[in-house]
């Protein structure tokens, strides 16, 4: 492709609203442009990268036995109401009405549509297992779109769905697609980890996320320093044991703590360690209000609270709800005096506290010498806190460290969550009606492009891995007015294309500095500069990833490039 014919508008300055490297560079290099908050156009070079990621995805999905189809982006509300997610999915689901007031959603995901499709067509175990996938635009009404393609309102996604007669069949396909995902991200050149995850609004049980390691990732990965254990911090269980002190219990005492609300403030004011404080929080679990207790130096994990109750929605109670329930402000909450009709659950660590501290449910006061079970009752002790760095790894090997990650893929064992809700059944080999067993497998295709850009860049621009680069080689005649340079550039361009390489020829009448700056921004793997030594049959070859350059004779160029790109 000749650069003079390409729409690739570059920017010299960093856009003010672009917070992270991938967002900045994809805009500056002219790979995309923003249309509205969280909505982007892919320009020609960006689209080439997107298509290469799609191709890798398709190859690995088909190798794993999946078959491609295409479902509608616009989905009838009735299907979502049938599954129960019309009400539980939340405000991220983009909803609309047609001229006849019939409700629809723009697809955030396609479980309902695929289940409806398959239940009408697959009636016997003889047609199972079946794995279908699509690459389709998805829509989510993000409250705060940010980070470019990493959190948008419109994005490209590969979503696959498998249907089975037995759990063993689901396990087999799940493992196969887990490996396919590992192959996809490895072929894209990414440094990633597969981690144990929460299924969230998707439902189901076993699930893994594929996380690209990056400091700008919005997720925290908890991993062992000596084993291959890795989990999203939301899902990492705490296996610590807590020893209760043999300190004698003291008499409960209420003390004034004016203007002291946060644990750090209260512990400093009372000269008591944070681990002897009891942090009390009120959560709304579906429609039920529950008091949750953790140690003062720990944080409540709301996903674990959700899993205790098998709830659809868990959120912090509002200040108004707390005041109505316990007649105090949030900073003075405590378990003492909470009436028996309000359930209290606590993290295991709370049970070991002796002569601790808690809010007194009265503004400006706390209790000291608080002892669980003597001073208040807990209905259940369980694991409710986030794991911390330095905790024992849940697999018993090593200790936990943290890393940040960008989620690019997610695989779920949905089980019968959707098939039972939507009456999607088949006849088994005994002629009995059974619900279809399902799996679900998603990849953020456009997000993967951003993740690659986030991992592969330097101070000068993008540094694309060979497998996804828009072109393999960038040929730059420095001076287009020079017949020797122009003709040699054209000859190299044509010969490399004949060898099967994708080549970009900078045939613009621009200054050398402009050409080199754009070349660094684009980040193609190999740059061939045709300069003053063209008359001698010599060019300069530069490897973008390493910065290494060498003068090469034109007759040796193809072999030299082949060794770089092998």
UniProtKB/Swiss-Prot annotation:
Q: Which EC number(s) does the record attach to this protein?
A: 6.1.1.15
Any Gene Ontology CC annotation: cytosol
Tell me the superkingdom of the source. Bacteria
Query: What is the enzyme's main class?
Result: ligase
Q: Which Gene3D superfamilies match?
A: Anticodon-binding domain (3.40.50.800), Bira Bifunctional Protein, Domain 2 (3.30.930.10)
Q: Which GO terms describe its biological process?
A: prolyl-tRNA aminoacylation
Select a single GO molecular function from the record's annotations and give it. Answer: proline-tRNA ligase activity
Could you list this entry's UniProt keywords, alphabetically sorted: Aminoacyl-tRNA synthetase, ATP-binding, Cytoplasm, Ligase, Nucleotide-binding, Protein biosynthesis
InterPro entries (UniProt xref): aa-tRNA-synt_IIb, aa-tRNA-synth_II, aa-tRNA-synth_II/BPL/LPL, Anticodon-bd, Anticodon-bd_dom_sf, Pro-tRNA-ligase_IIa, Pro-tRNA-synth_IIa_bac-type, Pro-tRNA-Synthase_IIa_type1
Renumbered to this chain, the signal peptide range is none
Pfam families linked? HGTP_anticodon, tRNA-synt_2b, tRNA_edit
Its localization reads: Cytoplasm
Catalytic function, reaction form? tRNA(Pro) + L-proline + ATP = L-prolyl-tRNA(Pro) + AMP + diphosphate
Q: What is known of its domains?
A: Consists of three domains: the N-terminal catalytic domain, the editing domain and the C-terminal anticodon-binding domain.
Report the family membership: Belongs to the class-II aminoacyl-tRNA synthetase family. ProS type 1 subfamily.
How this chain assembles, per its entry, is: Homodimer.
Chain's role: Catalyzes the attachment of proline to tRNA(Pro) in a two-step reaction: proline is first activated by ATP to form Pro-AMP and then transferred to the acceptor end of tRNA(Pro). As ProRS can inadvertently accommodate and process non-cognate amino acids such as alanine and cysteine, to avoid such errors it has two additional distinct editing activities against alanine. One activity is designated as 'pretransfer' editing and involves the tRNA(Pro)-independent hydrolysis of activated Ala-AMP.
NCBIfam families in UniProt: PRK09194.1 (NF006625), proS_fam_II (TIGR00409)
Q: What is this protein called?
A: Proline--tRNA ligase
Source organism (scientific name):
Bacillus cereus (strain Q1)
Gene (name only): proS
